Amino acid sequence: WSLNREVLDPNNLEVVDDYTCTSCHSNSDAADMPQLPAGQLDLGDGPSPDEPLHFNAYRELLFPDNEQELVNDALVDVLVDSGEVLEDEEGNPILDAEGNVQPIMVTVPVQASMSVNGARASNFFDVFAEGGAHHDFLTPSELRLIAEWLDVGGQYFNNPFDAPED
């Protein structure tokens, strides 16, 4: 996902556009400042905080995640009111120091864009179709390789001897 996909002006070789996936889909920008990954999809390198044996992008693409927002230069999960309030064991609302009920806050789920049920079950390819926001960002060969990988189950460890024992 971090493959350089800069588009250069043929006359002066200046960068006119950059379709590198991680330039938009990562949690930091080119100046290493925090940014909200485009589409809530972080394709950055490195281990996943959810499963250190997996790369971050693998988890982001194939597993549900929480919607995030940028607050004071930090990425935090978006929390919304569930409509319920904190209660004691007898069902009475627990009040805060000011006498207000305390709402129960929950995260906002973001569905995975890929599915191990195959390429056709994945929303991932929609943005690469004709007229899509990412049309021509990946080559037909790259898209075919991803589709075939999903069609065989999107395995992380293809060699059973490399898979962790747990």
Question: Where do the language-model regions lie?
Answer:
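Aromatic- and Gly/Pro-enriched helix-to-coil junctions and flexible linker segments
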Residues: 1-166
